[in-house]
């Protein structure tokens, strides 16, 4: 059962204070409890933008290269379930002026089908690929992985049936 919208709105109101809340985790017991409840089992990776900038060196061009967008596209192609959030909770919470708020996270996997429909919608594989392309063109960077916090705030599970692809901006996102 997904979480109600009021819970998401509460998170949006707390989000601007995330750095203060993060500092509280320096208190040993608060840090241990927070890690256990919200982050245990996380496996997240930021993928750099699709560009290579050589610095003062001559480089041979490799025959093949996996670009970060190809990693994301691989998982989209393999997934049976695709679900796009209709806003970025980070950018909406921070009232971002530099990047589109409507380019939200993409969730893959069976658990994504339990997300509250007021937050977004299921999409086809082609729509998911188009979504990440628009995110890249907007200058957003992909964060991909399994995130326990997403299963908590979205009220879904199991976590091993959900893969999150966030589309992060440098000014608002975690």
What are these regions (language model features)?
Residues 1-142, 159-163:
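Iron-sulfur (Fe-S) cluster-binding modules
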Residues 140-174:
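Redox cofactor-anchoring modules in respiratory/redox and cofactor-processing assemblies
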């Amino acid at each position: 059962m997904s979480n109600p919208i009021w819970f998401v709105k509460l998170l949006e109101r707390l989000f601007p204070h995330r750095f203060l809340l993060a500092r509280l985790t320096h208190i040993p017991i608060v840090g241990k409890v927070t890690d256990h409840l919200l982050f245990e089992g996380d496996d997240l990776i930021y993928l750099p933008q699709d560009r290579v900038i050589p610095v003062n060196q001559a480089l041979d061009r490799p025959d093949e290269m996996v670009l970060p967008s190809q990693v994301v596209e691989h998982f989209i192609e393999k997934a049976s379930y695709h679900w796009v959030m209709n806003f970025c909770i980070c950018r909406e919470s921070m009232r971002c002026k530099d990047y589109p708020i409507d380019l939200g996270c993409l969730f893959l996997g069976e658990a994504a089908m339990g997300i509250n429909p007021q937050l977004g919608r299921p999409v086809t594989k082609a729509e998911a690929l188009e979504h990440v392309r628009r995110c890249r063109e907007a200058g957003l960077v992909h964060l991909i992985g399994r995130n326990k916090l997403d299963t908590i705030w979205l009220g879904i599970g199991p976590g091993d049936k959900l893969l999150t692809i966030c589309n992060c901006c440098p000014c608002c996102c975690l």
